[in-house]
Regions:
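Glycine-rich phosphate-binding loop of actin/hexokinase-like ATP-binding domains
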Residues: 115-166, 170
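Short gly/pro/ser/thr-enriched loop/turn and capping motifs at secondary-structure boundaries
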Residues: 107, 127-128, 283-285
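Short beta-strand-loop/turn "lid" adjacent to the catalytic site in phosphate-handling enzymes
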Residues: 52-92, 97-99, 109-112
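Conserved phosphate-binding catalytic cores of ATP/NTP-utilizing and phosphoryl-transfer enzymes
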Residues: 96-119, 135
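Short glycine-rich anion-binding loops that position phosphate/pyrophosphate groups of nucleotides
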Residues: 11, 73-75, 124-127
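Active-site glycine-centered loops adjacent to acidic/histidine catalytic or metal-binding residues
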Residues: 7, 103, 123
Length: 313
Protein backbone atom coordinates (compact mmCIF):
# COMPACT_ATOMS: atom_id res chain seq x y z
CA UNK A 1 0.00 0.00 0.00
CA UNK A 2 0.93 3.64 -0.47
CA UNK A 3 -0.18 5.74 2.46
CA UNK A 4 0.08 9.51 2.25
CA UNK A 5 0.28 12.00 5.09
CA UNK A 6 0.06 15.77 4.69
CA UNK A 7 0.54 18.44 7.36
CA UNK A 8 -0.09 22.05 6.42
CA UNK A 9 0.46 25.14 8.53
CA UNK A 10 1.47 28.77 8.51
CA UNK A 11 5.06 28.22 7.42
CA UNK A 12 5.12 25.07 5.30
CA UNK A 13 3.29 22.04 3.95
CA UNK A 14 4.94 18.71 4.79
CA UNK A 15 4.00 15.59 2.81
CA UNK A 16 5.12 11.96 2.90
CA UNK A 17 4.46 8.75 1.01
CA UNK A 18 4.90 5.64 3.16
CA UNK A 19 4.32 1.94 2.89
CA UNK A 20 2.03 0.21 5.39
CA UNK A 21 5.02 -0.65 7.57
CA UNK A 22 5.81 3.01 8.15
CA UNK A 23 8.83 3.25 5.85
CA UNK A 24 9.02 6.74 4.32
CA UNK A 25 9.44 6.41 0.55
CA UNK A 26 9.17 10.09 -0.33
CA UNK A 27 9.06 13.38 1.56
CA UNK A 28 8.74 16.93 0.32
CA UNK A 29 7.86 20.33 1.73
CA UNK A 30 5.97 23.14 0.07
CA UNK A 31 4.75 26.59 0.95
CA UNK A 32 2.32 27.62 3.70
CA UNK A 33 -1.25 26.29 3.65
CA UNK A 34 -3.04 27.82 6.64
CA UNK A 35 -6.66 28.30 5.52
CA UNK A 36 -7.26 30.85 8.27
CA UNK A 37 -4.49 33.10 6.94
CA UNK A 38 -4.74 32.54 3.17
CA UNK A 39 -7.52 32.34 0.57
CA UNK A 40 -8.65 28.78 -0.04
CA UNK A 41 -7.58 29.02 -3.69
CA UNK A 42 -3.99 29.61 -2.57
CA UNK A 43 -4.15 26.72 -0.11
CA UNK A 44 -5.42 24.32 -2.78
CA UNK A 45 -2.78 25.56 -5.22
CA UNK A 46 -0.06 24.95 -2.63
CA UNK A 47 -1.36 21.43 -2.02
CA UNK A 48 -1.33 20.70 -5.75
CA UNK A 49 2.22 21.99 -6.18
CA UNK A 50 3.44 20.06 -3.14
CA UNK A 51 1.86 16.84 -4.41
CA UNK A 52 3.39 17.32 -7.87
CA UNK A 53 6.82 17.65 -6.29
CA UNK A 54 6.14 14.64 -4.07
CA UNK A 55 5.24 12.41 -7.01
CA UNK A 56 7.78 13.71 -9.54
CA UNK A 57 9.21 10.75 -11.44
CA UNK A 58 6.71 8.27 -10.00
CA UNK A 59 4.20 6.34 -12.07
CA UNK A 60 1.64 3.59 -11.75
CA UNK A 61 1.02 2.16 -8.30
CA UNK A 62 3.85 4.18 -6.79
CA UNK A 63 2.00 7.42 -7.54
CA UNK A 64 -1.46 6.11 -6.62
CA UNK A 65 -2.37 6.63 -2.95
CA UNK A 66 -4.42 4.05 -1.09
CA UNK A 67 -5.22 6.55 1.67
CA UNK A 68 -4.58 10.25 2.29
CA UNK A 69 -5.03 12.33 5.41
CA UNK A 70 -4.39 16.06 5.16
CA UNK A 71 -4.21 17.91 8.46
CA UNK A 72 -4.37 21.58 7.56
CA UNK A 73 -4.36 24.55 9.92
CA UNK A 74 -7.76 26.22 9.82
CA UNK A 75 -9.47 23.23 8.18
CA UNK A 76 -11.76 22.86 11.19
CA UNK A 77 -13.50 26.13 10.32
CA UNK A 78 -16.67 26.15 8.21
CA UNK A 79 -16.51 23.96 5.11
CA UNK A 80 -12.74 24.19 4.70
CA UNK A 81 -12.13 20.48 5.37
CA UNK A 82 -14.81 19.48 2.86
CA UNK A 83 -13.29 21.74 0.19
CA UNK A 84 -9.80 20.34 0.76
CA UNK A 85 -11.09 16.78 0.64
CA UNK A 86 -13.00 17.46 -2.59
CA UNK A 87 -9.86 18.93 -4.14
CA UNK A 88 -7.78 15.89 -3.21
CA UNK A 89 -10.52 13.55 -4.46
CA UNK A 90 -10.50 15.37 -7.80
CA UNK A 91 -6.73 14.88 -8.02
CA UNK A 92 -7.01 11.19 -7.09
CA UNK A 93 -10.49 9.97 -8.09
CA UNK A 94 -9.48 6.31 -7.65
CA UNK A 95 -8.26 6.74 -4.06
CA UNK A 96 -10.78 5.02 -1.75
CA UNK A 97 -9.83 6.79 1.49
CA UNK A 98 -9.34 10.55 1.63
CA UNK A 99 -9.93 12.76 4.65
CA UNK A 100 -9.01 16.30 5.61
CA UNK A 101 -9.26 18.00 8.98
CA UNK A 102 -7.65 20.34 11.44
CA UNK A 103 -3.92 19.89 11.94
CA UNK A 104 -4.64 19.42 15.65
CA UNK A 105 -5.71 15.86 14.82
CA UNK A 106 -2.42 14.79 13.30
CA UNK A 107 -0.40 16.80 15.83
CA UNK A 108 -2.09 14.76 18.56
CA UNK A 109 -1.44 11.48 16.78
CA UNK A 110 2.23 12.33 16.31
CA UNK A 111 2.59 12.13 20.11
CA UNK A 112 -0.27 9.80 21.09
CA UNK A 113 -0.78 7.39 18.17
CA UNK A 114 -3.88 5.69 19.57
CA UNK A 115 -6.62 6.09 22.14
CA UNK A 116 -8.12 9.14 23.77
CA UNK A 117 -5.97 12.13 24.61
CA UNK A 118 -5.59 15.86 24.39
CA UNK A 119 -3.26 18.31 22.70
CA UNK A 120 -2.30 21.68 24.15
CA UNK A 121 -0.99 24.25 21.70
CA UNK A 122 1.07 27.14 23.06
CA UNK A 123 2.77 29.37 20.54
CA UNK A 124 1.75 32.85 19.43
CA UNK A 125 -1.79 31.65 20.11
CA UNK A 126 -3.07 28.81 22.26
CA UNK A 127 -5.79 26.22 22.39
CA UNK A 128 -6.60 22.75 23.63
CA UNK A 129 -8.17 19.94 21.62
CA UNK A 130 -9.45 16.75 23.21
CA UNK A 131 -10.01 13.51 21.30
CA UNK A 132 -12.50 11.30 23.08
CA UNK A 133 -14.72 8.52 21.79
CA UNK A 134 -13.83 9.25 18.19
CA UNK A 135 -14.77 12.92 18.44
CA UNK A 136 -12.57 15.99 18.74
CA UNK A 137 -13.62 19.06 20.72
CA UNK A 138 -11.91 22.43 20.90
CA UNK A 139 -11.37 24.26 24.19
CA UNK A 140 -10.14 27.83 23.95
CA UNK A 141 -8.06 28.98 21.02
CA UNK A 142 -10.62 31.61 20.03
CA UNK A 143 -8.06 34.17 18.91
CA UNK A 144 -6.16 36.90 20.71
CA UNK A 145 -9.20 39.13 21.24
CA UNK A 146 -11.44 36.47 22.76
CA UNK A 147 -9.07 33.80 24.02
CA UNK A 148 -5.53 32.48 23.54
CA UNK A 149 -4.99 32.39 27.30
CA UNK A 150 -1.49 31.34 28.28
CA UNK A 151 -0.19 31.97 24.77
CA UNK A 152 2.80 33.96 23.60
CA UNK A 153 0.47 36.86 22.94
CA UNK A 154 -0.96 36.63 26.45
CA UNK A 155 2.50 36.52 28.04
CA UNK A 156 3.81 39.36 25.88
CA UNK A 157 0.77 41.50 26.63
CA UNK A 158 1.25 40.91 30.34
CA UNK A 159 4.91 41.98 30.08
CA UNK A 160 4.09 45.18 28.20
CA UNK A 161 1.13 46.07 30.41
CA UNK A 162 3.28 45.61 33.50
CA UNK A 163 5.95 47.88 32.02
CA UNK A 164 3.37 50.54 31.12
CA UNK A 165 1.73 50.40 34.54
CA UNK A 166 5.13 50.83 36.18
CA UNK A 167 5.91 53.81 33.92
CA UNK A 168 2.52 55.36 34.75
CA UNK A 169 2.92 54.82 38.47
CA UNK A 170 -0.18 52.62 38.48
CA UNK A 171 1.73 49.45 39.26
CA UNK A 172 4.84 48.22 41.06
CA UNK A 173 8.32 48.77 39.73
CA UNK A 174 9.54 45.73 37.85
CA UNK A 175 12.52 44.51 35.85
CA UNK A 176 10.06 44.02 32.99
CA UNK A 177 10.19 47.74 32.21
CA UNK A 178 13.90 47.80 31.41
CA UNK A 179 13.74 44.42 29.67
CA UNK A 180 10.88 45.49 27.39
CA UNK A 181 12.54 48.80 26.62
CA UNK A 182 15.83 47.10 25.83
CA UNK A 183 14.03 44.96 23.27
CA UNK A 184 12.20 47.98 21.84
CA UNK A 185 15.22 50.26 21.84
CA UNK A 186 13.11 53.07 23.27
CA UNK A 187 10.80 53.84 26.20
CA UNK A 188 7.73 51.64 26.05
CA UNK A 189 5.48 54.71 26.10
CA UNK A 190 7.05 55.80 22.80
CA UNK A 191 6.45 52.44 21.12
CA UNK A 192 2.66 52.21 21.29
CA UNK A 193 2.03 52.84 17.58
CA UNK A 194 4.80 50.41 16.65
CA UNK A 195 3.30 47.68 18.83
CA UNK A 196 -0.22 48.13 17.49
CA UNK A 197 1.03 48.09 13.91
CA UNK A 198 2.97 44.89 14.56
CA UNK A 199 -0.17 43.02 15.59
CA UNK A 200 -0.37 39.91 17.73
CA UNK A 201 2.96 38.50 16.55
CA UNK A 202 4.80 41.64 17.69
CA UNK A 203 3.20 41.41 21.13
CA UNK A 204 3.98 37.69 21.36
CA UNK A 205 7.62 38.54 20.81
CA UNK A 206 7.73 39.81 24.40
CA UNK A 207 6.70 36.44 25.87
CA UNK A 208 10.31 35.43 26.33
CA UNK A 209 11.01 38.75 28.08
CA UNK A 210 8.40 37.90 30.69
CA UNK A 211 9.66 34.34 31.11
CA UNK A 212 13.30 35.40 31.35
CA UNK A 213 12.56 37.94 34.07
CA UNK A 214 10.32 35.47 35.88
CA UNK A 215 13.05 32.84 35.83
CA UNK A 216 15.43 35.49 37.19
CA UNK A 217 13.08 36.06 40.13
CA UNK A 218 11.27 39.33 39.40
CA UNK A 219 8.20 39.10 41.64
CA UNK A 220 5.72 40.66 39.22
CA UNK A 221 7.02 38.62 36.28
CA UNK A 222 6.67 35.43 38.34
CA UNK A 223 3.10 36.33 39.28
CA UNK A 224 2.13 37.10 35.68
CA UNK A 225 3.78 33.93 34.36
CA UNK A 226 1.97 31.84 36.97
CA UNK A 227 -1.35 33.48 36.09
CA UNK A 228 -0.86 32.75 32.38
CA UNK A 229 0.19 29.17 33.12
CA UNK A 230 -2.91 28.69 35.27
CA UNK A 231 -5.11 29.88 32.40
CA UNK A 232 -3.63 27.36 29.97
CA UNK A 233 -3.75 24.65 32.64
CA UNK A 234 -7.44 25.41 33.11
CA UNK A 235 -8.08 24.58 29.46
CA UNK A 236 -6.11 21.36 29.81
CA UNK A 237 -8.07 20.43 32.93
CA UNK A 238 -11.35 21.04 31.09
CA UNK A 239 -10.13 18.55 28.49
CA UNK A 240 -9.00 16.18 31.22
CA UNK A 241 -12.48 15.97 32.66
CA UNK A 242 -13.53 14.30 29.40
CA UNK A 243 -10.75 11.71 29.55
CA UNK A 244 -11.16 8.47 31.46
CA UNK A 245 -7.45 7.73 31.67
CA UNK A 246 -4.83 7.90 34.42
CA UNK A 247 -2.58 9.72 34.06
CA UNK A 248 -4.24 11.96 31.51
CA UNK A 249 -2.01 12.16 28.42
CA UNK A 250 -1.57 15.60 26.87
CA UNK A 251 0.55 16.22 23.79
CA UNK A 252 2.33 19.57 23.80
CA UNK A 253 2.84 21.54 20.59
CA UNK A 254 4.21 25.04 20.06
CA UNK A 255 7.32 27.01 20.85
CA UNK A 256 6.39 28.01 24.40
CA UNK A 257 6.58 24.39 25.52
CA UNK A 258 10.32 24.53 24.80
CA UNK A 259 10.74 26.94 27.72
CA UNK A 260 11.52 24.73 30.76
CA UNK A 261 10.42 27.37 33.28
CA UNK A 262 7.00 27.89 31.70
CA UNK A 263 6.46 24.17 31.13
CA UNK A 264 7.21 23.54 34.82
CA UNK A 265 4.68 26.19 35.89
CA UNK A 266 1.98 24.51 33.82
CA UNK A 267 2.89 21.07 35.15
CA UNK A 268 2.73 22.42 38.72
CA UNK A 269 -0.72 23.86 38.05
CA UNK A 270 -1.91 20.53 36.61
CA UNK A 271 -0.45 18.18 39.21
CA UNK A 272 0.53 14.53 38.90
CA UNK A 273 -2.76 13.51 37.26
CA UNK A 274 -1.51 14.89 33.94
CA UNK A 275 1.37 13.66 31.79
CA UNK A 276 2.73 16.18 29.29
CA UNK A 277 4.16 14.48 26.21
CA UNK A 278 6.47 16.30 23.80
CA UNK A 279 6.26 14.76 20.32
CA UNK A 280 9.56 13.41 19.03
CA UNK A 281 8.32 13.10 15.46
CA UNK A 282 6.90 15.86 13.22
CA UNK A 283 3.12 16.30 12.85
CA UNK A 284 3.20 14.67 9.42
CA UNK A 285 3.79 11.37 11.25
CA UNK A 286 0.37 11.83 12.83
CA UNK A 287 -1.10 12.33 9.36
CA UNK A 288 0.43 9.01 8.32
CA UNK A 289 -0.97 7.31 11.46
CA UNK A 290 -4.50 8.53 10.67
CA UNK A 291 -4.25 7.59 6.98
CA UNK A 292 -2.89 4.15 7.88
CA UNK A 293 -5.88 3.56 10.13
CA UNK A 294 -8.21 4.62 7.31
CA UNK A 295 -6.55 2.02 5.07
CA UNK A 296 -6.85 -0.70 7.70
CA UNK A 297 -3.13 -0.87 8.42
CA UNK A 298 -1.91 -1.52 11.96
CA UNK A 299 0.36 1.08 13.53
CA UNK A 300 2.73 -0.44 16.08
CA UNK A 301 5.93 0.62 17.84
CA UNK A 302 7.76 -1.09 14.99
CA UNK A 303 5.87 1.10 12.51
CA UNK A 304 6.93 4.21 14.40
CA UNK A 305 10.54 3.01 14.49
CA UNK A 306 10.49 2.39 10.73
CA UNK A 307 9.10 5.87 10.09
CA UNK A 308 11.70 7.46 12.36
CA UNK A 309 14.60 5.57 10.78
CA UNK A 310 13.60 6.37 7.19
CA UNK A 311 12.40 9.96 7.55
CA UNK A 312 14.52 12.29 5.37
CA UNK A 313 15.49 15.46 7.19
Amino acid sequence: MRIWGIDGGGTKTDAVICDEGGRVLRRTQGGPSNCSARPMEQVLSTLTKTIRTLTAGLSGADAAPDAIFAGISGAGVGDNAARIRAHLQALFPQCPCIQAGTDAKNALRSAIPAGDGAIAIAGTGSGVFVFCGGEMQQIGGWGYLLGDEGSGFDLGRRALKSALRARDGRGPQTALTAACEQRLGKPVTQAIAQLYQGGSAAIAGFAQVLLQEAAAGDALAVAEARAAAAELAGGIQAAGRMLDTSPKAVATVGGLWQNPFYRSLIQQALGAAYRLIAPTLPPVYGSFVIAAGMAGATVSPETEAAFRASLPM
